[in-house]
């Protein structure tokens, strides 16, 4: 793919920015780093050049249409159905190039304050408009066999999103209780129904008591990046009838990573 092709296709991406920094790491301020440490989440605008967004879009097209990558369908056949694919890095060359050559690792390294970084996983999430409801509130840590302060998920949307459609986060919740995961088969009836059983405290019903929580979300344009600690409570807003939400999360960890024993089950993403 030559530069003209990249520029032409990049111009078709909705919401892409006309101006961006040659060194986006310099856009991360001490206040951003402090906010991440305090709240467990921070959004920074205009970090990724349209060329990198195009590369991710091509990679997603390959995942959905060409590869043998398994598509995990959550709430299959229900109104909230969405697609997730895990460890695309292993099989999709565009994702490998993004992880190695884009500034994403340097951006995460500055946010979490670690000079050394390791890739844990990457995941695509695809929600088509019209019938996809909320993604239930949850933390990622109950599903992962790791813990530490220097862990971050960089969430990148390929589509412009309103504040209502964006992910939502409970600020500061990464410093509190680690709750059980949600039960996909029961969550529509009871969002606090446990994934494991009685080995971890059940999730609170955040959606029914939103006024009790410091909930953060943003209007997003392609090129913006949300950095979030896996321990922060979060959930996905519904997509509107004429919109879609295609996003990738790059999960990286730094020097203070520790193995964490979880209740007996297969981890969502094994530590390999």
Where are these regions (language model features)?
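Non-heme Fe(II)/2-oxoglutarate
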Residues: 2-22, 69-70, 74, 167, ...
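Non-heme Fe(II)-dependent double-stranded beta-helix
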Residues: 2-39, 44-137, 143-145, 263, ...
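Short, charged/polar surface micro-motifs in flexible loops or helix N-caps
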Residues: 114, 129-131, 160-163, 175, ...
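Generic beta-strand structural signal
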Residues: 115-117, 121-122, 133-135, 150-156, ...
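Short, structured patches in soluble enzyme cores that scaffold and shape functional sites
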Residues: 123, 139, 156-160, 169-171
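Short, conserved beta-strand element in jelly-roll/cupin
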Residues: 145-162, 219-222, 227, 251-254
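Double-stranded beta-helix
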Residues: 163-232
């Amino acid at each position: 793919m030559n530069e003209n092709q990249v520029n032409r296709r990049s111009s078709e991406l909705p919401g892409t920015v006309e101006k961006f920094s040659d060194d986006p790491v310099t856009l991360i301020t001490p206040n951003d780093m402090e906010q991440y440490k305090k709240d467990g989440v921070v959004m920074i605008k205009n970090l990724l050049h349209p060329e990198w967004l195009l590369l991710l879009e091509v990679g997603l097209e390959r995942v959905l249409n060409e590869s043998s990558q398994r598509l995990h369908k959550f709430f299959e056949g229900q109104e909230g159905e969405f697609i997730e694919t895990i460890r695309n890095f292993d099989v999709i060359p565009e994702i490998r190039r993004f992880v190695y050559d884009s500034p994403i690792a340097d951006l995460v390294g500055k946010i979490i304050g670690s000079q050394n970084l390791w890739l844990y996983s990457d995941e695509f999430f695809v929600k088509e408009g019209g019938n996809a409801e909320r993604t239930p509130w949850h933390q990622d840590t109950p599903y992962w066999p790791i813990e530490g302060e220097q862990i971050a998920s960089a969430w990148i949307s390929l589509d412009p999103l309103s504040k209502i459609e964006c992910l939502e986060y409970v600020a500061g919740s990464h410093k509190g209780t680690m709750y059980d995961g949600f039960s996909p088969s029961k969550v529509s009836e009871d969002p606090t129904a446990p994934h494991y059983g009685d080995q971890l405290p059940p999730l609170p019903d955040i959606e029914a008591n939103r006024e009790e929580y410091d909930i953060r979300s943003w209007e997003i344009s392609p090129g913006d990046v949300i950095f979030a600690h896996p321990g922060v409570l979060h959930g996905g807003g519904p997509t509107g009838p004429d919109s879609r939400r295609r996003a990738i999360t790059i999960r990286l960890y730094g020097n203070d990573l520790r193995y964490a024993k979880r209740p007996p089950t297969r981890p969502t993403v094994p530590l390999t």
